[in-house]
Amino acid sequence: MRRRKAPVREVLGDPIYGNKVVTKFVNKMMYDGKKSVAEKIIYATFDRIEEKTKEKGIEVFEKALERVRPMVEVRSRRVGGATYQVPVEVRATRQQSLSIRWLLEAARKRNERTMVDRLANELIDAANDRGSAFKKKEDVHKMAEANKAFAHYRW
């Protein structure tokens, strides 16, 4: 383990919207350092969303991220030989990174032809409380609800 907490590096806003969350999404989506490819996919996705829903792509994106954000999650805690799943609240930074990760995983698992289509459809679904990423959040919340009895083991 490291001695000190790692400093949080500040990300710059993306070139078109100046939005830091879009930059984080691009960084998470990028393979092999190909940021320009990831950016092209994101912006094409926003255009595709605008074609399909007649809403601004960035607004649907933010709405989807908000809907997929987990409020609570379970963490394993060993107490006297037994391992309990203890529900804990999720910090805002972790909420954001989990929602980004879940949306990308869900989009990659979809079976549309291009990543633009997959991501656009997953974002639209998430914004409308559907899709794999939203289901993942619901499952995490159900686990926390089911293990509410162990909430007093928080640390």
UniProtKB/Swiss-Prot annotation:
In alphabetical order, the GO MF annotations are: rRNA binding; structural constituent of ribosome; tRNA binding
Keyword Cytoplasm assigned = no
GO biological process terms on file: translation
**Which CDD domains is this protein grouped with?**
uS7_Bacteria (cd14869)
Q: Which PROSITE patterns match?
A: RIBOSOMAL_S7
Q: Does the keyword Ribosomal protein apply?
A: yes
Tell me the keywords, alphabetical order.
Ribonucleoprotein, Ribosomal protein, RNA-binding, rRNA-binding, tRNA-binding
Q: Which cysteines are joined by disulfide bonds?
A: none
Q: Name one GO cellular component term.
A: small ribosomal subunit
Q: Which Gene3D superfamilies match?
A: Ribosomal protein S7 domain
Q: How does it assemble?
A: Part of the 30S ribosomal subunit. Contacts proteins S9 and S11.
Q: Which NCBIfam families match?
A: rpsG_bact
Q: What does this protein do?
A: One of the primary rRNA binding proteins, it binds directly to 16S rRNA where it nucleates assembly of the head domain of the 30S subunit. Is located at the subunit interface close to the decoding center, probably blocks exit of the E-site tRNA.
Which HAMAP family does this entry report, sorted A to Z? Ribosomal_uS7_B
Into which family does the record put it?
Answer: Belongs to the universal ribosomal protein uS7 family.
Q: What is this protein called?
A: Small ribosomal subunit protein uS7
Gene giving rise to this polypeptide: rpsG
